[in-house]
Amino acid sequence: MFFAALNRTLIISMSLAPLALLAPSALAQSETEAVVMKLQDEFVYGRNRGPKMGYVEPEVFEPLSDPLYRAGYKNYRPVGVTGEQMRMNAMDRTKDLGTILACADGWFWPFSRTARNNEPAGLEVEILNSIAKKHDLNIDMMWVNMSTRFGYGAPGGAFDLSINRGLCDIVLGLTVTGSDDHQLDPSQIVYSKPFMRTGFVLVTQGPAKGLTSLDDVKNLNVKLGLPAYSPMSDYADENGIPHETFFQNFRVIDAMVEGKVDAAMIWSGAISQAKLNRPEGQFQMVKGYVPIPEMRWDSAWGLKKTEVEFKKFIDDAFDEMLESGEIKRIVERYGMPYYPPME
C-alpha cells in the first residue's frame, strides 16, 4: 500500500511537471477561487496500540524481534565515554559525564522497560531519574536480559554483558534472596541499600472475599491459584495449603477471571499488569495484606564492590526518598502495593 501510494504521487508529479513549465497560467487559480491544498497520503508503520477485545498476554521482551531494541536499544553504552573517563571511579565518571550510566532489563514491568514515547519507563527507572535530577544529572539506560539460563551473575549472564564490561555503573531490578552470593561474588557486585520489598500477596473475589490470611485459606479449605515452580507453590506444598498451579502469574489471573479459582497468591509486581490487562476482573488484593516473612524479599540495585563513594551516593538518595515517602508514591502510582524494606 505504501509503495502504491508513493508511486501514484510520483507519477502524478512527473506528469504535471511539463505542464507547469509549458503553461503555468493554465494551472494557476484565479484570485477569486479558493485555494485548496490536498495533502499527500502518508503511511506510518508501528504497533497497533489501540483498544483490543479480550485479553492479550503480556508482551515478552525478545531482542531478536523487538523493533525498539533493534532500532537502538542494544547492549552497548548509550553515550560516548572516553578512555580517561573509563579509568575514573564511578562517582567521578558520573560527575564528568553529567550522566548516571545504568543497566536494567528491557522488559520487567512495572520496574523497567524500553519505554515508548509518553509512556512510563518503569518505577525503578523513575526512581533513578528522580535521584539524577536532584543532582543536575541525566540518566542513560542500557537494556540487558536479566533472565539468562544460569542467572544474571553466571558466565555469559547479564553482569558479564553489562557492568563487567564497564558499560554501566549500576544494575537495576535485583532482588535480595539471601542465597545469591554465587551470583554476586564472581563479579564483585554488592547490593545497594534496599528501597522496597516485593512478595506474594493474597487476591480474592466472589465467595472468597472474606479471606484475610493464609490461615483462613487453610482452615476453610479454599483452593488457591498459584504460579507453578514458584517459592509460593513450594510453601503451599510444605504447609498443606490446598492449591492448583498455573504457568506464570498472568495465567493465575486468567484462572480467576474464568472462575476456576476465587483466591490466589501472586507476586506483588504482577498486580499492576493484571489490572491493566484484565480490567473486567472482579479480583482485589486483600486490603492491608502484608506478605508473610517467608514470601517477601528486598529490592536493591547492584554496584561494583570497589565503588564505595558511588554506593554511598545511591544509599543516601534512597534514605532521603524513603523518609519523604517519594518511593512509596512512585510505586503506588504504578498500581503496585508498596512495602518498606526490611533492613
Where are the model-predicted features located?
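Extended ligand-binding regions for polar small-molecule ligands
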Residues: 33-88, 126-134, 205-208, 215, ...
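Extracytoplasmic small-molecule ligand-binding "clamshell" domains
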Residues: 49, 53-71, 75-174
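Bilobed "Venus flytrap"/periplasmic-binding protein-like clamshell domains
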Residues: 107-109, 118-137, 199-252, 268-270
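A ligand-binding cleft/hinge motif common to bilobed small-molecule-binding domains
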Residues: 164, 172-185, 254-257, 261-295
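Periplasmic-binding protein-like
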Residues: 194-204, 268-319, 336-343
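Bacterial N-terminal signal peptides that target proteins for export
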Residues: 1-13
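Hydrophobic/proline-rich hinge and linker segments of small-molecule sensing/allosteric domains
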Residues: 101-106, 189-213, 301-304
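Sec/Tat signal peptide C-region and signal peptidase I cleavage site
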Residues: 22-28
